[in-house]
Amino acid sequence: MLQKDMYKFAAASENEPIVFGSAQPGYGDEQVNQWIEFMQSQDIKRVCCLLTEFQLIRYSNLLEGYRQGFGIDRVCWAPIQDFNFVKPHVLMHQILPCLAAADQSQEKVVVHCSGGVGRTGHILAAWLVAGRGFSNNAAIAAVKQTGKNPYEAVIAAPFKGRNPWRSAAALNTLLTASKPSLSEAIDHSSF
């Protein structure tokens, strides 16, 4: 299996030059180093990690490994619970500024959760809406074409005791809210 497939590495959309998505590295130090080396071979300069503190426990120190591999000011940690959407304030004040800074610097950034599908997918869709001017539906469709699924939390909603229609509406609201925030995110970016 190619590393690209193993990590589910793909651009946010077919023509996206800066923002990419991926699965997490394996748990051993050697696997983390291989993941970092692979990302660097793809010219990735920044990382946005969506893993929760609980998910980081299995690593010796993943975020520190990223800081050593990419630089202390090139790592964004914005934890999102699995099968959930990002909190709007985290999207607007942490994640979008991270992605906007990468875009301004023309430095490729990879966003990752554990499987590289759901949490990563809806963040990539938010970027396409906020940073590239896509409509919500076009962003979701573009991300789905890359093998990610922004709707994963919607699909999982009944299993989590949530209404899937409300979850779908929440995703739409989140994407819509990300549109005007990008210029503000760029202005306030410290990433």
Each model region followed by its residue ranges:
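Cys-dependent protein tyrosine phosphatase-like superfamily
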Residues: 1-110, 115, 122-191
